[in-house]
Amino acid sequence: YIMLFKWNYKPPTKEEKQAADELGAKLNISPILAQLLMQRGITTESAAKRFFHPQLADLINPFLMKDMDLAVDRLNDAMGRKERILVYGDYDVDGCTAVALVYKFIQQFYSNIEYYIPDRYDEGYGVSKKGIDYAKEAGVKLIIILDCGIKAVEEVAYAKSLGIDFIICDHHMPDEELPPAVAVLNPKRADDSYPFKHLCGCGVGFKFMQAFAKNNGIPFARLIPLLDLCAVSIAADIVPVVDENRILAFHGLKALNQNPSIGLKAIIDICGLGGRDITMSDIVFKIGPRINASGRMESGRESVDLLVERDFSHALSKAKHIDCYNEQRKDIDKQMTEEANNIVSRLESQRHQSSIVLYDENWKKGVIGIVASRLTEIYFRPTVVLTRDGDFATGSARSVTGFDVYSAIKSCRDMLVNFGGHTYAAGLTLRWDDIQKFRKRFQKYVDEHIQPEQTEAMLNIDAEIDFRDITKKMHSDLKRFAPFGPCNTKPLFCTTGVYDYGTSKVVGREQEHIKLELVDSKSSNVVNGIAFGQSASARYIKSKRSFDIAYTIEDNIFKRNMVQLQIEDIRPAEEDE
């Protein structure tokens, strides 16, 4: 079931070209790159300077966030009264990094503090009664909850009845009613005028610590060692890498590369990233999944134990343990994705639906989110994957670009026990017997609201260029666009009418990739490229006919100072069709 990509490219107008020429001249970068800046809404010299040199001094004043003053006052009171504090968080990467960040920072000034990660299988998502009862037993008076809690109205009220206060730091969509916490920090609150809405949970935790430090005269420099955790959470939680997130991610990657905290250093070593320049995609594909794996397979607590560890040899053995979980997770994940694919291909009816809803009572709760993501990547449909939990079905929804899956799920709220999340990813719980009813309603909502182009495999091309445009300077300037992520994706270029230099060949264990050496008609430069999983195009390439390619420009790991094109799609040249 191969989706053919549609290429979406809008050439710049004459006016846009002229503006790009002028901006490029001012910044001493090529007009092509100036054009990319303008597509990202950066049109002035000063905006470009802020983009290329993100400054920690430009972080937003944390006290602009609603309830921040209340949160800082309550934390100060707890310390003054020597109350026991519990830092509580979700079991995913964002939750674990957030808990590690807040715990590590407060612990430098105050010792009566511990952390708690609920068990995905036993307690489920968010605030659990079990967690609150544990806090009561342990004599906790204040719970700081991170990356969840925005809907925990009953649980927070229950804690309050036991004399336990809550500070909520969350970034999921709030309902009309907020929990009765001392402070609810969430930039997505309808009544919050905080200028940046896309922080992740760890980001909200960082803002809380920034405010606490500011209020207590603690120098900002003490917060810098926490930025590596922010970068990991921003990449792994797939939030827009713009504005404040760009500043945090930029300086967080710097910390991750120059002096990572001990726990992260152990993970970097285990992933084989030591000595490499770590990027956002290394976090997404290597570091993040390992931190996630302990929460998916066993308990997220082990990840936090690792992230706050101070002794490197202990950290290394914990990282090895978590790596084993990740291997188990990969096996289960692969098996479940194959099963899900088989179901989709058997259910011809779902082939033509604009969404997919699948369920199986034997699927592992910790991995269904990944399976839902895989299915959206394969079929380009909003997808819900459910598994059984007693009389209930719990599951994950993932979306395609531009479609709000949270609203689709919200439209079924009368048959849901629970739901929460974001535009592109959400979680839900319903009665097992209601699955068919849910599927009908969900699919009807998607049918009525989705745009046809949202279910097509689209490649959004940033610029059309010739090989002679790819100079050393252009490549080094291009790297300054990083860190990449949603809303600042790695620029995708296309070049038309290229030819095989005669030396391209199929490679890989199963001969599935093509290693290319290419030329175009404008210059004699031979350019190296790799096309993963595209060996089906090899016959055409070797037929001496011309073709068009869409690609990103990468470092060539084997030849220093050389570039390599990572080719996303190959298609016969227009005139040959």
Where are these regions (language model features)?
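Hydrophobic helix-and-loop "lid/oligomerization" segment in the mid-to-C-terminal part
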Residues: 4, 11-142, 162-163, 213-434, ...
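Mid-to-C-terminal polyanion-binding domains and interfaces
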Residues: 77-83, 314-320, 324-358, 411-577
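Short, glycine-/Ser/Thr-/acidic-enriched flexible segments
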Residues: 92, 149-151, 173, 189-190, ...
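Conserved strand-to-helix beginnings and helix N-cap segments that scaffold or border functional pockets
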Residues: 99-100, 128-129, 156, 178, ...
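Short alpha-helices
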Residues: 101, 179-218, 223-235
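Conserved beta-strand segments of alpha/beta enzyme cores
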Residues: 112-114, 165, 183, 528
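Histidine/acidic-residue-rich, glycine-tolerant segments that coordinate divalent metal ions
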Residues: 146-199
